[in-house]
């Protein structure tokens, strides 16, 4: 079970985090999974023998589950050891406002802190959900502001970050790119250009795909 993407939606996300736009385009089958895009975040050696690309959203509950169950081990076991080049690609599944704002915040934090921001937002989903309907994240603004401050951004810098037209355009392009790669839900992983099945949404799913490649 993953969070699905409606590829034909064209929406304007207003309200809790006003001024954030989201556009989604149609789907094609021209995968470009190993090419670094302007909206991507990456970790590890660029020339590592294995490239793992994850399409995810900070507002996707299943992504948050896998983030806790797999990613710390994955980073330590494969990325930090030089075996894997990891690319994270943002998708706008889940609450669109929070997804856009969260990913823009990660970009504004800089490459050294981007993954810290992604992790912090995913771990704060339940807190953002307090006081409102499920997955509406009515408490998102104070939580995201706090996370911004934890990586050295003021509230004013945070506000400018999540409403920056250039940043929003980058997010739109990243979203379009994911759809062109045939991604229809999150989380989705490609390993050396091949989409892998997810069954348990923990480290075993990644181990099962990566270990055979390391033995070649």
Describe each PLM feature range.
Residues 58, 65-149:
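Structural alpha/beta surface segment adjacent to cysteine/selenocysteine redox centers
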Residues 39, 47, 92, 104, ...:
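A general structural-boundary detector
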Residues 20, 82-83, 113, 166, ...:
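Residue-level recognition of short, well-ordered coil/turn positions
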Residues 47, 108, 161-164:
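Functionally engaged cysteine thiol sites
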Residues 2-94, 98, 172, 214-216:
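Extracytoplasmic thiol/disulfide redox context detector
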Residues 2-9, 29-33, 57, 145-216:
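C-terminal cap of thioredoxin/glutaredoxin-like
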